[in-house]
Amino acid sequence: MMLHNAKASDNNELDQAKPLIPQLSDKQKEALNDACGRIAPTWPLDELIAVNPWWEMRDQHISKVSAKLSALSQAQCVMPKSYFQEVWMETLQPQHVQQAIDEMEKDYTVDNLERYLLEEDEHTHWHNVSDFVDSGRDRKYKMAWRDEITHQISQFCADFFRLKDSQGTFSKTYQGLYHEWLATTRQDKGIEILMGEDGLTEHFMDLPESSESLLAEALVGLRVPDSQIADYAHALLLDANGWASWVAYLRWQDRLSNAENDLMMDFLAIRVAWEWVLWQHQKDSDRSVFNELKVMWHHQMSILPDLIATHEAAQAKSWIWQRAAEIAYQSELQQQLKHASRTDQKVETESPPVLLQAAFCIDVRSEVIRRALEAQDSRVETLGFAGFFGLPIEYQPAGTDVSRPQLPGLLKSGIKVTPVMTKVSKGATKQALNRKARWIEWGNAPPATFSMVEATGLMYAFKLLRNSLFPESHTNPINAIPATDAFELTQNDSPLTLDQKVELAAGILHAMGLDHDLAETVMLVGHGSTSCNNPHAAGLDCGACGGQTGEINVRVLAFLLNDESVRQGLLEKDIKIPAQTRFVAAMHNTTTDEFTCFGLNHVDETIQKWLARATEFARQERSTRLGLNHLEGQNLHQSIQRRAKDWSQVRPEWGLSNNAAFIVAPRARTRGVDFQGRAFLHDYDWQQDADNSLLTLIMTAPMVVTNWINLQYYASVCDNHVYGSGNKVLHNVVDGCIGVFEGNGGDLRIGLPMQSLHNGEKWMHEPLRLSVYIDAPQKTIAQVVAENDVVRHLIDNEWLYCFSWAPDGRIHRYFNNQWLESA
């Protein structure tokens, strides 16, 4: 019995000796999930679409988000005072500033706001542990911890996600992103040597094996209060915002499939681990320095809410200047809309029959070419619709297993499209893709980097010389759509039935307003761009098509709508397509303004002449922004062609720069109005939308997409270091498509390069929040807002402006559940 008791006693002692595994409390988990949820995604280069980098914080007012980001990471969401000084001298009027003051109910005067622009900014910001340690480090002889942490995490992620991507999934031994990083870092003795810090590796060896244990241990050790965890974690994620955004993209893709992953929490754990290692290392290295660090750290933690409040107060006047700049633009635009309303009321007694209806993407670049095409003849009618033309598809080249989405990033594809081809053509396509894949795989493999240069250097030197003297366009085989008018549409590996095709076609025609009064020729115009040696080329293509050209979408839709069996089925839905009506797929090249029509036998000579003249008109209008307004005709054409094929050209076109408005109305109300390529134009007739379903669709999809585009350009101008990708000339592509580094390291860069925003002398994009004008009853607009939280957050938190545009020209702003007449 005594022996038994002794053994029991021994076991109790052993149990007590076992270290407890740290665990997060429910409050801590909630706070960490909050921080992880604040990061917006960035898409890969081959599917590049514009993203609002503050999307995941849309439920907060933009000024509060701005203050928090400024306090936590020095990221800027509003332009600097120097910018507003220039705007004040050049374009703003006192009445614009006064109106902004009145709107925001601030006790300021125009004079003291002007003085504010001359004051120096002196505001402290949050410092992570690594920043405090760097402040006492001899930077002449030692590398900064901030730089090393960024470099180490970035290089690890580049390698890790390259391997994951090439395999299509994680390996069988994968135990989590944090675990993989920990194993890699423990084996890397070079960090200790590089940083000149003996004993550093031991602290990595002591880190917990799981991300949750690490987070729990570090939060306790660093004495982070539950109330400050979310902001502290957010600050750490902002330290590596590029890779955090990539992880957010992987999360986004999983959620489209109703799945979840823990990558963001693991990524956060990696950054927290570095904080904890440095804290422990300082504690062991120099107790007196550590004590100073501890005092500063805990003091900073205690005043974090006050720090954020200080930044909010400091930025208040800048937001008035921002609002004044937006009022200046809105005032001018609204005068155009009011004048257009007066003109629109002068109804013609007789209108010539429409010979051509051309449906374009709502992209701001389409506004210029649409206006040019309409100017050719009164029998031309254009309309605007989302560039994927309502097709929820992904494109799979014949004879392959690869596919790409052809729809907005907000949506998940449901239909797979494959060209109908002969066996010989399928085989040729497959061989071309396999050759391309092997070449890319060889070039991207780290061990092959130098051997590839040695083996192909002479060939590439010749290629470089050839491209310099005889520039030409190059197309990836997966983007080369074969010359066929037939496509196979499948869903869940089964061909679409006729009823499904009819249902799809009917929905699209109704949404586009093409379910009645059709012309003999209806052009479906997608768009794409042309540039060389441009990692961000997909960003110049159609964002609504997932960063691809719209070619496959318009060709598939034309195929469906020209199908006699589909037309017969549409009759049962009271949609009659006249026998003489032909749908023609076409492409608008936004770089050269040229049109390409597929099936020219359906486009008569008159229409071809209209298209050619419209190209000349649009090209001449755009020449000023390109710095080519000294050229005309053929000389201008040749110059633009050279730009498009020049491998050294960093500004082939200006993309969607200077976008500022989204107008939802019948084209008849805006025809002839020069929006200067700054407005997204979406056709909509509320009288054909009895159940408000079309307006709901527009405000929850295209309006959200335009917000993403608008705020990506806005953010890339406000803070290109954080939300832009820097100097295009210095870009190095990460794993073929993940993103770019600026130079050979640092964080993954997101957003737009400087050359897409600035011409070397001035900004080519004016950073203004999107102004949305909707021709619909106010009650209807308010109902859509009330029923959709995303829309309400965007409007009430001033991520965009929402206006009603009445038939008599009156304009009212909707804000906080009330309509306010706009001056």
UniProtKB/Swiss-Prot annotation:
User: By what means is the activity of this protein regulated?
Assistant: Intracellular DIC accumulation is sensitive to CCCP (carbonyl cyanide-m-chlorophenylhydrazone) and DCCD (N,N-dicyclohexylcarbodiimide) and therefore likely driven by either proton potential, ATP, or both.
The reply to whether Transmembrane figures as a keyword in the UniProt entry is: no
Q: Which residues bind Zn(2+)?
A: 361, 363, 527, 542
Q: What induces it?
A: Induced by growth in low levels of dissolved inorganic carbon (DIC) (at protein level).
What InterPro entries does this protein's entry cite? Answer: DabA
- UniProt keywords, alphabetically: Cell inner membrane, Cell membrane, Membrane, Metal-binding, Transport, Zinc
Q: Which GO terms describe its cellular component?
A: plasma membrane
Primary role: Part of an energy-coupled inorganic carbon pump. Probably involved in transport of dissolved inorganic carbon (DIC) with upstream gene dabB (Tcr_0853); has been suggested to be a proton-DIC symporter.
Query: What family does this chain come from, according to its entry?
Result: Belongs to the inorganic carbon transporter (TC 9.A.2) DabA family.
Identify this protein by name: Probable inorganic carbon transporter subunit DabA
Q: Which gene encodes it?
A: dabA
